[in-house]
């Protein structure tokens, strides 16, 4: 779950 969230955040940033 964490890796997915970090991936989304990095994508948004």
UniProtKB/Swiss-Prot annotation:
GO terms for cellular component: extracellular region; membrane; other organism cell membrane
Major subcellular site: secreted
A GO BP annotation: innate immune response
Name this protein carries in UniProt: Temporin-1CSc
The UniProt record lists the keyword Membrane: yes
Similarity field: Belongs to the frog skin active peptide (FSAP) family. Temporin subfamily.
Tissue expression summary: Expressed by the skin glands.
Leucine amide carried by residues: 13
Signal peptide: none
Protein location: Secreted; Target cell membrane
Keywords: Amidation, Amphibian defense peptide, Antibiotic, Antimicrobial, Immunity, Innate immunity, Membrane, Secreted, Target cell membrane, Target membrane
Functional note: Antibacterial peptide. Has activity against the Gram-positive bacterium S.aureus (MIC=64 uM) and the Gram-negative bacterium E.coli (MIC>128 uM). Has no hemolytic activity (LC(50)>300 uM).
């Amino acid at each position: 779950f964490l890796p997915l969230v970090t991936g989304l955040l990095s994508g948004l940033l």
